[in-house]
């Protein structure tokens, strides 16, 4: 690879690091081209799965200000640059790694911190943002309904008490 090509590749990878919300580093030893294509399809638009030389990736990470990943760049390494929700991409990679033992999750990077394999798996086990928002909305709606019932209860109790008093007075006047 010519020096100019290497510089261009480093700049491209550094730009991907900067543009991504998270990255997941994997080892792809033993995967076929068809397997990699299947993984890229599983990731969809949530991430870009890139294979690059480790030395170029190390330089690009340094250029992008990302630290703590150097030890992950050994052996055949590929990186998933996550554009959207990190949970969706981590779920897809974890599921693919479960089905294809040749794919090994090495770690990742998110919110300025290097992630261990356990961290990436924890992220994969989280609910997606949409599901969490739906659960929050449901909980809020339930609590609002309870609060409305509590606020309405004293008024209805007063109304029932007034009706009972009125009936009692009407009964006393009739007698």
Curated annotation (Swiss-Prot):
One of its GO terms (molecular function) is large ribosomal subunit rRNA binding. PROSITE patterns: RIBOSOMAL_L10 (PS01109). Keywords: Ribonucleoprotein, Ribosomal protein, RNA-binding, rRNA-binding. One of its GO terms (biological process) is translation. GO terms for cellular component: large ribosomal subunit. Part of the ribosomal stalk of the 50S ribosomal subunit. The N-terminus interacts with L11 and the large rRNA to form the base of the stalk. The C-terminus forms an elongated spine to which L12 dimers bind in a sequential fashion forming a multimeric L10(L12)X complex. Forms part of the ribosomal stalk, playing a central role in the interaction of the ribosome with GTP-bound translation factors. NCBIfam families: PRK00099.1-1. Belongs to the universal ribosomal protein uL10 family. This is Large ribosomal subunit protein uL10. The gene is rplJ.
